[in-house]
Amino acid sequence: MQTRGHGRLADLAKAFRPWQNHPMTAILHRHLPDDMRITRALPGIRPETGPWLRVDEAYGAQMARREALLQAEADDVLYLEEAARPAAQELLALVLSELPALGYGIKDDGVCCPDGRQVDVDVTAPMRTLGRLCQCDFVLMQKRAAQHVLTGAVLCFPASWRLREKAGRPLTDIHVPVAEYDRDVARRVQRLFDGIQVGRPLWRFNQLWYQDPELYQPRSAHEPRRVGARSDTGPYYRTERQTLLRLQQSRAVVFAIHTLVLARADVPPLT
């Protein structure tokens, strides 16, 4: 029997995780790109030979979810240090230059997106504007002392981490809960960040099985691990295409995260 006190605690927990109280229609991909059908050890980095920004079959549905999250969960999905604003604005300008090749229309009064939405370009809110234009999330990392630090982000589709806990922290702190991210991998990733060159983006991807297809899955490092973590028996396959590139003026590193979720039946054989 549940005590009254336990009931109140449960209600409080739900209040702090409102996204769990409103089930959404699953936003699923039906296809997995050919170059994401293999497995590689961390960090599994390779040169990006195609476009680093993409528009795919789930664009419309994912963008509707992003718009809703930017309205309802802005404090959880947006972060920008004032000192990082020039880098964020530089990233926005770069993204705008890439959009016409992806089917966007650039007009004096804003952007016409592939799903028909008209988005005003607000340079005073660069991360929010990026979140309204693109499927992928963007994380800004800038070098401070010996490490890159998270100085800005739009993170609508977190996979079991919370932006507010990682904001302003260095790479090693950001990856502390990840079991595979040991000291050797941390050193390799920091060397990788130091070596990223302008105009030569790199990419990798991860592979996780989830019980829940919801794209917005923030989880505190202090909360229990999600159900099914480290198991390959879940009904949904979640993978992130993670692209790294360096901005020319600010020298910031951009971490672009394009999320795909597939039902198990639609996942092709992985080699």
Labelled PLM ranges:
Residues F16-T271:
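Extended, well-ordered protein cores
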Residues M1-N21:
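N-terminal amphipathic/basic-hydrophobic helices that include classical n-h-c signal peptides
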